[in-house]
Design a protein with these regions (language model features):
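Conserved small/polar residues in nucleotide/adenosyl-binding loops
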Residues: 148-149
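Short, conserved clusters of charged catalytic residues that mark active-site
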Residues: 23, 72, 128-135
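Active-site acidic/histidine proton-transfer and metal-coordination neighborhood
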Residues: 5-119
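Short, structured active-site "lid" loops
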Residues: 1
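Short hydrophobic/charged patches on amphipathic alpha-helices used for structural packing
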Residues: 29, 134-137
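Core-facing hydrophobic residues within beta-strands of well-ordered domains
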Residues: 114, 143-144
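Short, conserved loop/helix-junction motifs that constitute active-site signature segments
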Residues: 138-142
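Active-site glycine- and acidic-residue-rich loops that bind
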Residues: 95-101, 124-133
């Protein structure tokens, strides 16, 4: 489903595509530092999103396994951003594993509260999910580093 985002030589090979994407983010961390940019935006990925709806029932531990894998993939990237003194803002977005405050908190927990984990806030995504976009600011203001308005 995500092949269209990668160059042709990485399509139809999820392992190679994932490695390419990881390398692109590592380059982005370095480029951000070179440009004097202190915050960078990204999406989290969607390992568990397709299983969000509770029917049919998902296997026990699926969400735990997905967030464990998500953090395994992101920790080296977060560490690279940290070594370049750049925060990484995850856009809270339907279709992504980080799609609300609770999933952001879960990711934060699985990354051991990594200091570079921040949030891009776009209230339109909250409206689509019928979430209270104003209280989100009160609760997560310390993590909001970028905003789409």
């Amino acid at each position: 489903m995500f092949d269209g985002f990668a160059p042709k030589e990485f399509r139809n090979d999820p392992k190679k595509r994932t490695e390419w994407a990881k390398n692109q983010l590592i380059l982005a961390a370095k480029a951000s530092k070179n440009l004097g940019i202190k915050v960078h935006v990204t999406f989290s990925g969607a390992l568990v999103w397709p299983y969000l709806y509770p029917w049919p029932q998902r296997p026990d531990g699926l969400v735990h396994t997905a967030f464990k894998e998500l953090s395994r993939r992101w920790l080296p990237i977060l560490n690279e951003f940290d070594s370049n003194d750049v925060d990484l803002c995850y856009e809270i977005h339907p279709g992504e594993d980080l799609h609300d405050g609770l999933t952001f908190e879960k990711f934060l927990k699985y990354t051991n509260n990594h200091s570079r984990v921040k949030m891009l806030y776009d209230p339109s995504h909250f409206i689509l999910q019928q979430l209270d976009y104003l209280s989100h600011i009160d609760i997560y203001h310390e993590y909001l580093s970028l905003i789409h308005i």
